[in-house]
Amino acid sequence: MSPLPLLISLLAGCGTDPVQEDVAAYHDAMTPLLAKNLVLAQGFLDVASKVKKGDTDAPQIAERLVSEITPAADQLRAEAEKIEPVTPKLGEAHALLVRAWGDRAASYHAMSDAWAQNDPAAFDLARKKNLQSKLDEETFFQTVNTIAQPYGLLIDQYP
């Protein structure tokens, strides 16, 4: 028996791993978005700390939420929606992130409205929705890094 068929089958199987390629492409696509996410989080934390300290009056907080924070959250969600992983598990994890970032953007809109209308109950409800979106985002990072880790990659939440 000729060793040629075995050699051909071995060479055919030596191609790159499609999951590894997808994870690497995903890592590269997500890194700039995660950098923007870090800037967004820092901006929101700045506003939140001012609210907590009472440093800023209601119109200024609402204006910053409306003019800076909320549009950045909307844009980030829209950019994330454009990324379409090929691997089903990676796609499912990414869908969780897109949903979390969408919920966060919606909570920022609701906080802006509640703050402008001086409605503490509505603000608290929006704040709780924001906290849940953060938990969902954490679940995403755990899930996606379980997928990426075998390939020596980390989807870094704080690049």
Label each residue range with its predicted role.
Residues 1-4:
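Bacterial N-terminal signal peptides that target proteins for export
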Residues 22-101, 107-108, 114-115, 122-159:
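Alpha-helical segments in soluble extracytoplasmic regions
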Residues 15-17:
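Bacterial signal peptide processing site
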Residues 10-13:
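C-terminal motif of bacterial Sec signal peptides marking the signal peptidase cleavage site
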